[in-house]
């Protein structure tokens, strides 16, 4: 990407084996949405994955085997409903200014993630 937003979601979106590079915001879940990513790469974005929703029509809380590299903020959780634990098992966070900015204090599990 060349700035802007790579994926601007307003519904449930399931991403598998996708690459997001060079965006202002790679993927964002807007109101009513949930963006799930598995085996995806987020690199050189200002924000990799962003949640800014107060309700969601469907959830998918497993964020396994993703790579977040050299982003300003890898994952930004401004607002996210529910109490499903976001699981980053197998995901790698490397060279980001901020790995996870969880303003919403949503439950997350990084026990099986790697931080470099």
Language model segments and positions:
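Extracellular beta-rich repeat passengers
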Residues: 1-116
């Amino acid at each position: 990407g060349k700035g802007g937003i790579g994926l601007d979601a307003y519904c449930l979106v399931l991403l598998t084996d996708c690459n997001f590079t060079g965006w202002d915001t790679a993927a964002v879940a807007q109101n009513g949405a949930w963006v799930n990513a598995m085996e995806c790469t987020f690199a050189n974005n200002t924000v990799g994955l962003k949640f800014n929703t107060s309700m969601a029509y469907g959830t998918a809380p497993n964020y396994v085997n993703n790579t977040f590299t050299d982003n300003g903020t890898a994952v930004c959780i401004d607002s996210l409903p529910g109490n499903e634990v976001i699981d980053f098992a197998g995901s790698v966070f490397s060279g980001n200014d901020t790995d996870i900015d969880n303003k919403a204090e949503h439950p997350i599990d990084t026990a099986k993630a790697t931080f470099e």
